[in-house]
Amino acid sequence: MRQKHYLEAAAWKLQDSCPGQARYLLWAYSSSHDDKSTFEGTCPYCCQLLVQDKSRVRLKPKPKLTPKIQKLLNREARNYTLSFKEAKILKKYKDSKSVLLITCKTCNRTVKHHGKSRSFLSALKSNPTTPTSKLSLKTPERKTPSSANLNHTSGSKGKSPALIFRTPTSGQSTSICSSKNASKTKKHFSQLKMLLSQSESKKNPKMDFRNFLSSL
């Protein structure tokens, strides 16, 4: 497998500088193996790389929907009985495939690549292989402090009773957090009040008896 990829990469590198050497590398690998179509994008007959200048590509489409076939489809949908000839025409229409024709300009041989039939595509549309539930992305679960405390207590069941007794419950943890937040806000408020009083004292000095006499 590694040798195959190495030879294919070397052939694509040599297709402009030495196309004969590129064809020889592909032919040497294909001749030593039973499967002739081992390389994609190459001619299975002469091992020529099917690039734009050395190949011709055509598409043979599926047969179009005619009024006769549409009438047969409507009769089949209504569960009407069809004759052998009509059923054969309808089966041929459903099993029809698009064909990609690639002609190699070196050996003038054509390679056919068949597509999927109408019946397969209709079945694929009606019964998708990948359900929509798998395609939906899962939202990550957010852990709250209460859930973390519950997980901690559940994980500490196998420990000693002293450790289990010391683990606070969710209500106690919330009350402790609220008391800590209240003390922090009171401390910040007192500091702000002290700063404001200092600034006011700097702007308005104390009116003692000496200042009062000097103002007169």
Swiss-Prot record:
Bias (Basic and acidic residues): 200-209
Transmembrane annotation, as ranges: none
Modified residues (Phosphoserine): 126
Keywords, alphabetical: Phosphoprotein
Annotated Pfam families: DUF4674 (PF15719)
Residues bearing PTM Phosphothreonine: 130, 139
Cysteine pairings via disulfide bonds: none
UniProt similarity note: Belongs to the UPF0711 family.
The protein's name: UPF0711 protein C18orf21 homolog
